[in-house]
């Protein structure tokens, strides 16, 4: 069932939305090969050092894009999440544009108000969420990246393969 904003989309966007909604899994070639990279992100978050978190996150996303044979993503890790009366921003995906030759992901590692390092699982879900936007453009060749049920299932697919598999 489409989300409420679907009915306001133009026909061309509805077509993209429906295509996105049908894709539910991310088919990694070897998720177990990526588990050490996930552990490195966890260790980096524990260190509370932004540079460590950025390096580990970049290495993990590099391996994901290599396995999926798609262009790489530049990962930026920022400190405190921006926020306003409407909420706070956890991550941001910026596709390739005339200005940038590589797509970029920004992920915030500290909570907005308390300035605490975000929980590992929360950080990973945010990182995978932004990676899924990249997959929409580069792997699935969609002209836009909508938050569909399929999109969130793809995010969960990455999470299950790379975080839950490591916790078992």
Role assignments for model-derived ranges:
Residues 122-131:
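Short alpha-helical catalytic segment bearing the HExxH-like zincin motif
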Residues 140-144:
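A short acidic/glycine-rich loop-to-helix N-cap element
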Residues 68-72, 134, 138, 162:
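Amphipathic alpha-helical interaction segments
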Residues 2-15, 73-81, 99-110, 161:
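Short charge-dense sequence patches
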Residues 1-51:
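N-terminal low-structure segments adjacent to metalloprotease catalytic domains
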Residues 158-168:
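Short helix/loop segments within enzyme catalytic domains
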Residues 81-121, 134-137, 147-158:
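Active-site scaffold of zinc-dependent metalloenzymes
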Residues 49-103, 166-168:
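Auxiliary, metal-adjacent structural segments of Zn-dependent hydrolase domains
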């Amino acid at each position: 069932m489409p989300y409420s904003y679907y009915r306001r989309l133009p026909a061309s966007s509805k077509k993209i939305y429906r295509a996105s909604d049908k894709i539910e899994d991310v088919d990694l070639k070897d998720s177990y090969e990526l588990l050490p990279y996930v552990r490195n992100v966890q260790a980096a978050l524990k260190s509370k050092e932004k540079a460590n978190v950025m390096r580990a996150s970049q290495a993990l996303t590099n391996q994901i894009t290599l396995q999926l044979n798609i262009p790489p993503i530049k990962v930026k890790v920022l400190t405190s999440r921006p926020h306003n009366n409407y909420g706070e921003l956890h991550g941001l995906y910026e596709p390739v544009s005339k200005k940038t030759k590589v797509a970029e992901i920004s992920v915030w590692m500290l909570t907005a108000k308390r300035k605490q390092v975000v929980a590992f699982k929360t950080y990973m879900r945010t990182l995978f969420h932004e990676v899924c936007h990249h997959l929409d453009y580069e792997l699935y060749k969609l002209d836009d990246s909508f938050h569909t049920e399929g999109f969130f299932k793809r995010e969960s697919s990455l999470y299950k393969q790379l975080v839950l598999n490591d916790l078992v």
